């Protein structure tokens, strides 16, 4: 049985750099398999005008400030940057980190930041997912040492583009976030090494079946794709205590509790409850949990996941 893998996703909003980096360093020391942050330039929870750090420069800092965990954006906003530049950036981070980079990419969804920066948001989500597919195909080829020229009529206009240096890793992994059944999961099937999704085990079991069908149609072995589920987790000895901690975290992030009342991606409770929850996801093939951690990054939750929850899940499996 594969062991449970844990990733720490450090919210990039409502933090200073020192607090962000020290929490990443702690996650690395504790033995998290991967450390991630968002790719946003305005805050996405609560007040959008809160402080927030930029994605790729933050990854460069993580590359130098950690030693063993993989690092990536969950997930990169494809609209923000030319995909060739993204490939160049992630290769640089791969060298800075000694071969620990993951290329995270998604279609982008947060309108406020696109409006503020004047970034093209496309005609709608469908078009952004078409751009994502085209970008991911190009990035995979570039990372594999191929020369890329764009077809006419697409979003991008690459001409005899190639990367030097290539990544440290022989196969630098691509992580795609999202679970749209027609487009996103087709892109996952074609190019992704990792896939991140949110939802109940029942919902993700269904999405997984859709992904398998796409894999079959593009001729890819679905077992090559690591399934990861995201959750925002707070662990304490009682659910009431965990809830109080969550309330403090949300207050720090200037986010009213009413905003998240119906959000089933917040998992708040005891270590035993998390073990049960993780086991339910393992039943449907999700062996990696990417734990979103709001600033100022609760150390007790970070520790309990590694010291209590992971051994409990592995023992039960």
Go through the PLM ranges and name each one:
Residues 1-317:
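Active-site-adjacent structural elements that line small-molecule/cofactor binding pockets in enzymes
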